[in-house]
Amino acid sequence: VDPNRRVLTDYSIVIANDKITALGPSHELENLYRDATTVIDAAGKVVLPGFVSAHNHVGYAVFRGRAEDVGYAPTHRLYLPMSGVITNSEREVIGALAVTELLRGGVTTILEMEEDAELFAPFIESSGIRAFIGVMVNDVNLDALASGQTVFDDTVRTQQLSQAIGLAERWHGRSGGRIQAVMAANGLSMSSPALLKGLRAAADDLGLRVSIHLGFGERELVESVHHRAQFDYATDCGMLGTDVIAVHCYDVDETEIDMLAKSGTSLAHCPHMNQFRGEVAPIQAMQSKGMQIGLGIDNYFSDYFEVLRSCIASARIRAHDPEVLSAQDALALGTIDAAAVMGLDHEIGSIEIGKKADLQIIDMRRLGLTPTNDPVATLVYHGHGKDVETVIVDGQVVVSNGRVQTADEDALITQASQAATAAWDRFSQRYGSFVAPAPN
């Protein structure tokens, strides 16, 4: 996915330490590098840049198979109730499984934002994945929120900002820069002006990006709580700008798209999750205004190929045009464009000399991928995460022969299954079902 979107045939890649140092015809490089320490035979295979997911909540994998039919982000009926019954150890192992799945499926970079993101940071680092990590702050009183009221709490705000800044100070730049921090907020309706302005100040002081859910169906709530239109409030609090990653933005009008574009705000587009909520973001209109857009997985899912297909399908449905957004376009959104959203396009997102060696290798000689008339189109429309054979991050092989090398997959599957079962048992005992009642 270089600037010319070339598909190179019978080429080899040379990696030294964490970078791509040579790229050229195989017959030339094989002669020049006969003494290479490690050789990966990719004959009959396709090498792609690793996928970049600009938005993740790995701990939310506990809701897989529970939340997809509950509608919009089910904060009151699932998220808040579950937070009161699940243990840290259960969340930790479920999050570890989600990270492992992402790596296994060719995802080499994520942006993980969650209320207790530091819980997942040690495993994220040891897994070998590249990541931005941030505490997803809000300062509402949760007891009041559970009853349908929005009340901001000064004590909560102080604690949340301290936690977010603390994570950044402890984790930013770890593992040679593979782990970075991000300042993150849940959304506008759950965040006071003081919280968001404090987050903005912290991001400026630490030189970090900001990520926040915007334009995702809280328009009326924001106006009710803050007495401001959603993007006016975002502007007031410093939540639009060249270092801001807005997430979702499916509920935006033309004026709001102009505000996003003129401010230089980037978009983490999560089409697969949006579809399950019956929503489609107007990315063609955003791109026409010059917005930088990249893809994100979001929470319950892990197969990035499904995200690519959802991106294409949703764009074509919205445009009523079967030729909008090609396979090449979608692949770019999931690699170099998503890297640009995170400010990493100078380092990752394409296979070019001097860039980080973040790669995935897929064997095309298998059912579902044959015949391969066009490797990009075949993979985008027919590939799956389970087809990925090898994954390299920072020059290190983290997946080999379809198995993650940095974690015990079998143990994680068992432990995460047990953790989820225990958490849902407590949930159903408390609420009488697997979905809590809506607040009055």
Where are these regions (language model features)?
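Active-site microenvironment of metallo-dependent hydrolases
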Residues: 1-11, 16-21, 26, 32, ...
